[in-house]
């Protein structure tokens, strides 16, 4: 029960419950835009099949949760917690992931660059640490660069589709998907290539200031 409530609060803060039905977000680029680093086939399957499945299953789980609440069915409410966490986390994680990638690449600057240099010594050090920790994930999961309320940056990994903020309290800035569907068709079992690709900056176009503002907007939306 507590897990279901905790996930609901996190989802609200992320702005995902500002609409009744979750939908698959459009990509800000074509499926082939990231080639040759990430193939169009992988992007199409990853987005339109895998992410769509998380969205569909999350909607089903939330419908069942609403019905269970109306009936006061505590047993069913508790039993839905794993599905909400897994599919809700998959939706949150992938929605962030697509925005982290850019055909044009880009390097951190301004407030984000200053924070990286402060907490890791350099962008290269941060990349190496993020790569090493993410490669070490056993099975499926994610590697993240996130920040805490005080503004310090941290690297963390999460298993399966566990969402970063609900699991660690860190606000996600940049995520790396190391589920096999994210790379296996193209790179087989060579995970490291996907973590430090030659054609796309590890940081993409993210900025600390922009991510903080998005978090504030999501909180305002959930309270409306």
UniProtKB/Swiss-Prot annotation:
Gene3D superfamilies: Fe,Mn superoxide dismutase (SOD) domain, Iron/manganese superoxide dismutase, C-terminal domain. It comes from the Eukaryota. Keywords: Manganese, Metal-binding, Mitochondrion, Oxidoreductase, Transit peptide. Its EC number is 1.15.1.1. It is found in: Mitochondrion matrix. Binds 1 Mn(2+) ion per subunit. One of its GO terms (cellular component) is mitochondrial matrix. One of its GO terms (molecular function) is superoxide dismutase activity. InterPro entries: Fe/Mn_Superoxide_Dismutase, Mn/Fe_SOD, Mn/Fe_SOD_BS, Mn/Fe_SOD_C, Mn/Fe_SOD_N, Mn/Fe_SOD_N_sf, SOD_C_sf. Its cofactor is Mn(2+). Residues 1-20 form a transit peptide. Its main location: mitochondrion. Pfam families: Sod_Fe_C, Sod_Fe_N. Belongs to the iron/manganese superoxide dismutase family. This is Superoxide dismutase [Mn], mitochondrial. It comes from Charybdis feriata. The lineage of its organism: Eukaryota, Metazoa, Ecdysozoa, Arthropoda, Crustacea.
């Amino acid at each position: 029960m507590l897990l279901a409530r905790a996930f609901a609060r996190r989802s609200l803060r992320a702005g995902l419950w500002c609409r009744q039905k979750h939908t698959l977000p459009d990509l800000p680029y074509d499926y082939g835009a990231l080639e040759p680093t990430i193939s169009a086939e992988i992007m199409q399957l990853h987005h339109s099949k895998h992410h769509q499945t998380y969205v569909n299953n999350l909607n089903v789980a939330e419908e069942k949760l609403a019905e269970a609440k109306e009936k006061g069915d505590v047993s069913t409410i508790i039993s839905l917690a794993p599905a909400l966490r897994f599919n809700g986390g998959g939706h949150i994680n992938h929605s962030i992931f697509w925005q982290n990638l850019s055909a044009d690449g880009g390097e951190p600057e301004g407030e984000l660059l200053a924070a990286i240099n402060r907490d890791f010594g350099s962008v290269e050090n941060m990349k190496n640490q993020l790569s090493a920790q993410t490669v070490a994930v056993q099975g499926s999961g994610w590697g993240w660069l996130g920040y805490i309320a005080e503004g310090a940056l941290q690297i963390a990994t999460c298993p399966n589709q566990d969402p970063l903020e609900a699991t660690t309290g860190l606000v996600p800035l940049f995520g790396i998907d190391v589920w096999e569907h994210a790379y296996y068709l193209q790179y087989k079992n060579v995970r490291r290539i996907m973590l430090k690709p030659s054609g796309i900056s590890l940081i993409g176009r993210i900025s600390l200031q922009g991510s903080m503002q998005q978090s504030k907007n999501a909180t305002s939306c959930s309270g409306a």
